[in-house]
Amino acid sequence: VKENKRKLDDENFKLLLFAENQKTGRTKYNGILDAYALLENYDKQKTLTLESQIDQGYAAEKLGGYKRAKIYYRRALKKAPDENVDLILQLVGELKRLYERSKDHKSLVQIYKRAYGALKKSSRPKKELRTYAYLIGYHQFFHLKQNKNARVWLMRSDGGGSSTQELQSAYWVAKLDQQAKKPELALKRLKELSGRKISKKSALYVQIHFELGTLFHLKENWDSALRHYRFAAKASAPEEFKKIQTVAEEKAKEIAKYLKSIKAAQG
């Protein structure tokens, strides 16, 4: 074929690709890319099909050509039909690994939105849909500083349940409300959140009740602040949250002392 002695039709190309796939290591992946480079000379459009782009992306990644692999996988993702959710999620997974490697949070959000869009049109479990909403919101909040957008996606990821993902999403929305100087909204959200089933051994249990204690403290709602500070202080939280628990315990003692002094003054 390379010496132009044989036309590279579909059958011959399949034979060539099969032969290259029988090889091992770098020889195999270089051979695959060379085969597609040769095909391009005969019919460029055939190198741009969905299957061809995936093949080339896989080979490029195996050879350490991460930038090149991203281009191939991105094209494949664009061509993948929404109905083929499994393929879309597979390609999103390939690109996720590459974008995480280069810390490209903007592109991660783009591919997660593609997954979300396909899942929304499908009859797959809502849990999968909420997972991608969570990932979008997470990257927008912590890496891209797009707080308004992050809030929308994090709210979509919270189905009102008690999974770690849902609890974390609702907590972050409350934090965003606080940052937006909307304490009443944050308080309302945290109160609703505290009513869900949350393990007293979890970090979130401490964080939620500490935040509630702080917000009630600012409102001078002493009884409520005392109650939530005590919840936070008495929880069996992970070691890294002991400092917050110590602060909660100190705040609870201060409020209890203050309430006692008021009661004494009133006779």
Which sequence ranges carry the predicted segments?
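Single-residue signature of alpha-solenoid repeat helices
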Residues: 28, 32-35, 69, 108, ...
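Solenoid-like repeat scaffolds
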Residues: 2-6, 40-48, 77-84, 114-125, ...
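"A position-specific structural signal for the A-helix of alpha-solenoid helical repeats
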Residues: 13-17, 55, 90, 94, ...
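TPR/TPR-like (Sel1-like) alpha-helical repeat modules
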Residues: 222-241, 246, 250-253
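Residue-level recognition of tetratricopeptide repeat
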Residues: 20, 58, 93, 97-100, ...
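Structural motif corresponding to the intra-repeat A-B loop/turn of tetratricopeptide repeats
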Residues: 26, 63, 102, 143-144, ...
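Residues that mark the junctions of alpha-helical repeat units in TPR/alpha-solenoid scaffolds
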Residues: 8-12, 32, 49, 84-91, ...
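Hydrophobic/aromatic packing residues within the alpha-helices of TPR/SEL1-like helical repeat arrays
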Residues: 32, 36-39, 73, 112, ...
